Amino acid sequence: MKRIEVSTEIGSLSVTYQKQKKMLVCLNGAGLLPSYENFSLILEKLPPTIGYLTIDFPNTGRSPIHDQAGKNLDNLADAVYKVLEELAISEYILCVHSLSGILACKLLKKPIKCQALVAIEPTTKKVMFADFSENPYPEMEEQMRLIDECGPELYFKNLTQETFSPEINKEIWELMQEKGSELENLDTGFQISGEITEE
């Protein structure tokens, strides 16, 4: 496993990878969680012939703080594509979670062709701009009740403790607390993420 930082228009991106001809490119959803740790249970199961690449977007995981004012989804897609080019990736499977579902739609139009797309709970424009007054996700009621009952941080801590080894769980929380502290100390005009519009 190697870690590098790639300088892009949206800021420096922390990239974790193990190079092979065929690559699994994993992109996180919103939140502070580092991508490598978030996808570690999948990455551990890959055969040695398949490499992997995870990218921490600005202000998440191991990537440094960088103001995203004036940035948008196209800028983020261009930044991810720059990482693919820099690492000379020519064949890849894209594995996205949540908000990166929208990003996947942009990446699929780029010249380096994606062989397959695996979308885990993808967010799409239809989901982002949906009317939630009719509760379109009844299966999430229990999850929302638990979050309300114990608070989001405790709920998430319990979830990561059940999912990850003690070592990885500790590293996840150390990184998230460090990033959270950095973000709390920023000016009020600082923009954490780029804009996503209906276009």
Residue ranges and their predicted role:
Residues 54-93:
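Active-site loop/oxyanion-hole signature of alpha/beta-hydrolase fold enzymes
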Residues 96-100, 104:
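Gly/Ala-rich beta-loop-alpha elbow adjacent to hydrolase catalytic centers
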Residues 128-131, 147-199:
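Conserved alpha/beta-hydrolase catalytic His-Asp/Glu region
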Residues 94-96, 120:
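Short beta-strand immediately N-terminal to the catalytic nucleophile in serine-hydrolase-like folds
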